[in-house]
């Protein structure tokens, strides 16, 4: 009957499990025989092997990958016995912690290829190693997990180029092959390169093409730098390249304002210009610097446009009620740009001093609301009645009355009254001149209607059928049938 495994068997099985570093840091000859030289997978494994191999420090005189590989090759009881060693347990915990790291993500988001940062990290690492005692022993685990790795160029990773400084990526011709120190404390910084996978993902932001940053003015400094990267990029899309936003803080004296400079598709650099927004047409306000300055020039260096007008111009007086400067700025359609401090009066213009006593302010001509509004602004002017034209037809009064006894009809036109009088007198001045017809009529419209009988003209056409009529009242009676 098979017995359950004991503690020694479990320790042996745990020790026999190969680690990730042993696969990545195998013999160079066996990798060359199994994989073709210069393959992308070979380069990726070569980079991982360099990243997994810790540099020997004075307080840590061992190589983690080499030590673990030696212990695994020895195997057997020796490995079981060494599992109880605290130094080996500490090394194994460090190795498992390194296996859990997403190295591609860390390398693609760490600023490790700039000379200034590399020199700073190297100096701090050497200072910390020199300050720690050499007799600390191998059981003390590193606190910052700092290790160095070289980045090799394309081609065979085992063959070093002779003219390009050891075949390193992004290395200058005259510079020796540097090793890029990696520190877990620098993950919050941003770098566009670091690794073969990161090079394939973001080749357009290599640090070689980033110009050196310009020195900041006194009182100002870089507050933040953000790299916005889209996860799904399509060819021809405006989001295919990451955009960098640099924010520079302003100085307390106001000489250097806050700069927010967005970039898209190019290397990040500080932009000396700020986008100027257009002033709205109905904004009667100026900035605080313009009020405190002696001239009418604005704080941004531009002259006010046609909608911004000086307040000290002599204007003709009107009968409209005057408005105070506070009521003018707090009106419904005009919004002030900055709130005025208590006790501060608006700048009257170049013709008057910026601050006047109360006795002198009474002599300044009062400003009217309609005078400040430019033509074509938000508030329309009151409509003025046009001369010579009536806005609505005046109702006519019936002034013409029939003087016949018992009639008493009134008309607005004299011609209508004249036609009516013919009914009383029996006068018919309109005669039909058709051959053989002697009809006479008192009104001209009656003669026109009669003449259509001779000609057959029917100008009133029905819209729902093909019938036509010579009189409009006949068409009205016909339309009642369709309804």
Curated annotation (Swiss-Prot):
A zinc finger (C2H2-type) spans 400-424, 430-454, 460-482. Keywords: Activator, Cytoplasm, DNA-binding, Isopeptide bond, Metal-binding, Nucleus, Phosphoprotein, Repeat, Transcription, Transcription regulation, Ubl conjugation, Zinc, Zinc-finger. Disruption phenotype: Death shortly after birth due to loss of epidermal barrier function resulting from perturbation of late-stage epidermal differentiation structures including the cornified envelope. When selectively deleted in the surface ectoderm-derived structures of the eye, embryos develop normally and adults are viable and fertile but mutants display down-regulation of Krt12 and Aqp5 and multiple ocular defects including corneal epithelial fragility, stromal edema, defective lens and loss of conjunctival goblet cells. Residues 443-474 are annotated as: Interaction with target DNA. GO terms for molecular function: beta-catenin binding; chromatin DNA binding; DNA binding; DNA-binding transcription activator activity, RNA polymerase II-specific; DNA-binding transcription factor activity; DNA-binding transcription factor activity, RNA polymerase II-specific; histone deacetylase binding; lncRNA binding. GO terms for cellular component: cytoplasm; cytosol; euchromatin; microtubule cytoskeleton; nucleoplasm; nucleus; transcription regulator complex. It is found in: Nucleus; Cytoplasm. Highest expression in the colon. Lower levels in testis, lung and small intestine. InterPro entries: Znf_C2H2_sf, Znf_C2H2_type. Residues 22-42, 294-395 are annotated as: Disordered. Induction: By interferon-gamma in Stat1-dependent manner. The keyword Membrane does not apply. Its main location: nucleus. There is a cross-link at residue 32 (Glycyl lysine isopeptide (Lys-Gly) (interchain with G-Cter in ubiquitin)). Residues 338-356 have a biased composition (Pro residues). Changing residue 46 to A: No change in KLF4 polyglutamylation. The modification Phosphoserine is found at residue 251. Ubiquitinated. 'Lys-48'-linked ubiquitinated and targeted for proteasomal degradation by the SCF(BTRC) E3 ubiquitin-protein ligase complex, thereby negatively regulating cell pluripotency maintenance and embryogenesis. Polyglutamylated by TTLL1 and TTLL4 at Glu-381, which inhibits KLF4 binding with E3 ligase component BTRC, thereby impeding ubiquitination. Deglutamylated by CCP1 and CCP6; deglutamylation promotes KLF4 ubiquitination. KLF4 glutamylation state plays a critical role in the regulation of its function in cell reprogramming, pluripotency maintenance and embryogenesis. Residues 386-395 have a biased composition (Basic residues). PROSITE patterns: ZINC_FINGER_C2H2_1, ZINC_FINGER_C2H2_2. The 9aaTAD motif is a transactivation domain present in a large number of yeast and animal transcription factors. Belongs to the krueppel C2H2-type zinc-finger protein family. Interacts with MUC1 (via the C-terminal domain). Interacts with POU5F1/OCT4 and SOX2. Interacts with MEIS2 isoform MeisD and PBX1 isoform PBX1a. Interacts with ZNF296. Interacts with GLIS1. Interacts with BTRC; this interaction leads to KLF4 ubiquitination and subsequent degradation. Interacts with IPO7; the interaction facilitates nuclear translocation of KLF4 in dental papilla cells. This is Krueppel-like factor 4. It comes from Mus musculus.
